[in-house]
Structures are given as C-alpha cells and as structure tokens.
Amino acid sequence: MVKPGAHTSALGKAVHDTARKNGLTVIKNLTGHGIGRSIHEKPDHIFNYYSKWDDVKLKDGMVIAFEPFISNNEQEVDQSYDGWTLITEDSFVAQYEHTIIVSEDGPIVVTK
C-alpha cells in the first residue's frame, strides 16, 4: 500500500475501514502529510478516510508522516481556548504516528 504510484486515498480507506470494523470512526479534519526539510511538505494531506477526489500519488523517495486519528464517536476536533489543545464534545481520540520512506523496495518505517 505504501509504494511509489500508490494513491494516498488507499491509506485513508484502510484507516477508515479498520476503524469502522472495530466500531470506531476517524477524525476528518486532521491528516498525515509529507515531511522532509520542513515539518509539512508534499503531499499536503493524507486523509484518514477515502475521498474519490484525492488522486495524490506517492513517489519513490517521498517521506510521509502517517497519522491516523481514531475516535469512539466524533468525526472532528476543535481547538481549545489555549490555542493548542484539540478537543471533542464527548469523545475519546487516539493518534499514532509513523514516519515512512516510500521506496521501490517497500516502505521503510523510520520511527520504530
């Protein structure tokens, strides 16, 4: 799934399908992204759900921050008054992140 030529939408579909299978949902207003010399690079987003308009393809050598955000109820988070904390009205949210190098030889997870 993480290989040159693969669509980022396939990652989002896998995250969303896995969440639904387990009675959970995904946070739709937070995404993964490309990473490199800057904290946010191309691709600008890696959704946690499938979008038919998301036709971004992974390229060999690209580095991505894969960040699934899973919730037991809500699909969006809001920013708290402190300008930093993200909150929901009545849900728990979990997030896990891996930095992955896209390679012809297979994905290289660098955050093990």
Residue ranges and their predicted role:
Residues M1-K112:
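Active-site neighborhoods and metal-handling regions in enzymes and metal-associated proteins
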